[in-house]
């Protein structure tokens, strides 16, 4: 990382009441002397004029100076808070760039400086972007928890436990002549089991955090005229899809993005699945399967007037057998207003079965509660945190290495191989917080930030 002094507009582009220009780096003091004529007292608001090189006033407002390392970035930071007109702000940035050694900041570079100066770790840096991009109150609360270090704390505890166990195992290997067989006395196994249990709990929280950030993709699938589009409309609370009595009305994928008590849900209505010679309908069915294969959950819509079966393997075995392994399925017996079925949820061979009427709305609220529970909804998420897909992947890699290490210990008492699996798990976990992270990954993460962060 360079030690350049950087400048950018910290407030959103456009017209506003206040506009903020942020400068970070060792030449921030030079900017203060050039633009203000003096260096403001650190951490005090200084009302003054912002001047051009010729001494002409560009704007007037508040100047704030933070002496590094006691600043967000860890560098000397100067913030100029003036009027929010874009022309004025552009003039001010142009003036700052006239000072030697100043350049425009790249996206996320202020946060990158903070990361490089150990002011925050990678999950906290990502949480800044997640807090800005939050689309619900719960997402904002969870992002703030991550920014305050809740996720980092969990990961650091895991890393410390894995590191401690690895050192213990390596010590056992280095001193094989000790009377006690460290690998078989149960201490290492118990410590490993506790780490695995802890990791499973963190994975569950991270999965929920990922859903809060990215949402859950739910695909409504089934035969033509089962009521899929009616269910989409009922869940969305508006007429998003055309509904007719003609089978095959929906020929393409329809998407709706809604929030259930702050939990983002991506609902996808698909073409009815059947054998057909209609070219356009065939394309729609192919697209439907593409959506199903990438779904987090499938709502299997069944026309309750056509069958009394509740086991999906009895209703349509070919459909169930074609679904991806481990894809969750909820069976929806629709048209309960016609069949007279009780609006109850039952479990049938591991499948949740709901009776609803998408047309009248009967049972839809219960289905929404079901979807919220699948997303891990809690009425109070003060202790939750935001997680990204890369975090889930790193946790999964760490889990796989710990499981392999468990096998090496239980089956072979292979201390060297256990130590290596622990090392790999440690590296995977450390990548989450950025303790061991490639420059390519850092560049990718920070480039997704807005310019002034």
Curated annotation (Swiss-Prot):
InterPro entries: G_TrmE, GTP-bd, GTP-bd_TrmE_N, GTPase_MnmE, MnmE_dom2, MnmE_helical, P-loop_NTPase, Small_GTP-bd
Localization per record: Cytoplasm
Keywords linked to the UniProt accession: Cytoplasm, GTP-binding, Hydrolase, Magnesium, Metal-binding, Nucleotide-binding, Potassium, tRNA processing
Sites where the protein binds K(+): 225, 244, 246, 249
GO biological process: tRNA methylation; tRNA wobble uridine modification
One Gene Ontology CC term in the entry: cytoplasm
Molecular function via GO: GTP binding; GTPase activity; metal ion binding
Enzyme Commission numbers on file: 3.6.-.-
Binding-site positions, (6S)-5-formyl-5,6,7,8-tetrahydrofolate: 22, 79, 119, 453
Domain TrmE-type G: 215-376
Summary of subunit composition and partner proteins: Homodimer. Heterotetramer of two MnmE and two MnmG subunits.
Protein function: Exhibits a very high intrinsic GTPase hydrolysis rate. Involved in the addition of a carboxymethylaminomethyl (cmnm) group at the wobble position (U34) of certain tRNAs, forming tRNA-cmnm(5)s(2)U34.
Protein name in UniProt: tRNA modification GTPase MnmE
Source organism: Shewanella oneidensis (strain ATCC 700550 / JCM 31522 / CIP 106686 / LMG 19005 / NCIMB 14063 / MR-1)
């Amino acid at each position: 990382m360079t030690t350049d002094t950087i400048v950018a507009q910290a407030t959103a582009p456009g017209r506003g009441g206040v506009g903020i220009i942020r400068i970070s780096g060792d030449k921030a003091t030079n900017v203060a002397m050039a633009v203000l004529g003096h260096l403001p007292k650190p951490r005090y608001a200084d009302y003054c004029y912002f001047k051009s090189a010729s001494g002409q006033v560009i704007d007037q407002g508040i100047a704030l100076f933070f002496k590094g390392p006691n600043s967000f970035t860890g560098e000397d930071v100067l913030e100029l808070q003036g009027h929010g007109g874009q022309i004025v702000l552009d003039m001010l940035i142009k003036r700052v760039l006239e000072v030697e050694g100043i350049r425009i900041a790249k996206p996320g570079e202020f946060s990158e400086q903070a990361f490089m100066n150990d002011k925050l770790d990678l999950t906290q840096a990502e949480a800044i972007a997640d807090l800005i991009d939050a689309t619900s109150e719960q997402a904002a609360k969870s992002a703030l928890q991550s920014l305050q270090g809740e996720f980092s704390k969990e990961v650091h505890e895991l890393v410390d436990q894995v590191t401690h166990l690895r050192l213990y195992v390596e010590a056992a290997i280095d001193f094989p002549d000790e009377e006690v067989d460290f690998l078989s006395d149960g201490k290492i196994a118990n410590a490993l089991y506790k780490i695995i249990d802890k990791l499973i709990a963190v994975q569950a929280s991270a999965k929920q955090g990922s859903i809060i950030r990215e949402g859950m993709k739910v695909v409504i699938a089934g035969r033509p005229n089962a009521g899929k589009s009616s269910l989409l409309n009922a869940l969305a609370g508006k007429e998003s899809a055309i509904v007719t009595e003609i089978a095959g009305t929906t020929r393409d994928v329809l998407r709706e993005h809604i929030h259930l008590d702050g939990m983002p849900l991506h609902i996808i209505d698909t073409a009815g699945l059947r054998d057909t010679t209609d070219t356009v309908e065939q394309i729609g069915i192919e697209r439907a399967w593409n959506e199903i294969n990438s779904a987090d959950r499938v709502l299997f819509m069944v026309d309750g007037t056509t069958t009394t079966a509740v086991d999906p393997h009895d209703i349509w075995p070919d459909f169930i057998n074609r679904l991806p392994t481990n894809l969750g399925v909820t069976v929806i017996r629709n048209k309960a207003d016609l069949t007279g079925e009780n609006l109850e949820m039952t479990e049938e061979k591991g499948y949740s079965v709901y009776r609803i009427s998408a047309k009248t709305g009967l049972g839809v609220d219960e289905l929404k509660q079901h979807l919220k529970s699948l997303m891990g909804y809690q009425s109070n998420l003060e202790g939750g945190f935001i997680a990204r897909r890369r975090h889930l992947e790193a946790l999964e890699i760490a889990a796989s290495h710990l499981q392999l290490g468990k096998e090496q210990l239980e089956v072979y008492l292979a201390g060297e191989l256990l130590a290596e699996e622990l090392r790999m798990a440690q590296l995977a976990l450390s990548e989450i917080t950025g303790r061991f992270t490639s420059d390519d990954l850092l560049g990718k993460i920070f480039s997704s930030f807005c310019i002034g962060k």
